[in-house]
């Protein structure tokens, strides 16, 4: 998140830190076999949308809630450590929740419908000032 650091910081042969880049992140996730995370809401939803199995290692209460919901939705498994072997075992039997993808794709239509319904209610409840003059 620091603009003045290198794009990639290599710690060793197995660990690298990358500057935050939404497009590169999503491209990387789209090409990965599985995803390990601390269970941040957005990245778990992105993994679910892309059909990627997830290992979630929550660090605080919001992440605990996200991980619990995602596990119940079939997105992945919860652990207290980044046990990548467990993730790979889970990935071998994982089936993406296509209902989630369909639901996400329908959101724009659903939101527009709800807004239009709200507008219809507001218009029906409006009155003309002339009626009171």
Model-derived features with residue positions:
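C-terminal amphipathic helix plus adjacent low-complexity
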Residues: 89-133
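Donor-nucleotide binding loops and adjacent catalytic segments primarily
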Residues: 1-34, 44, 64
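Catalytic binding pocket for nucleotide-activated donors in carbohydrate/polymer assembly enzymes
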Residues: 43-99
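Hydrophobic acceptor-binding patch used for acceptor engagement in glycosyltransferases
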Residues: 34-35, 53
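Short acidic active-site motifs
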Residues: 23-25, 86, 110
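Short beta-strand/turn micro-motifs composed of small residues
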Residues: 1-2, 37, 56-58
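Aromatic "clamp/platform" in nucleotide-sugar-dependent glycosyltransferases that forms part
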Residues: 40
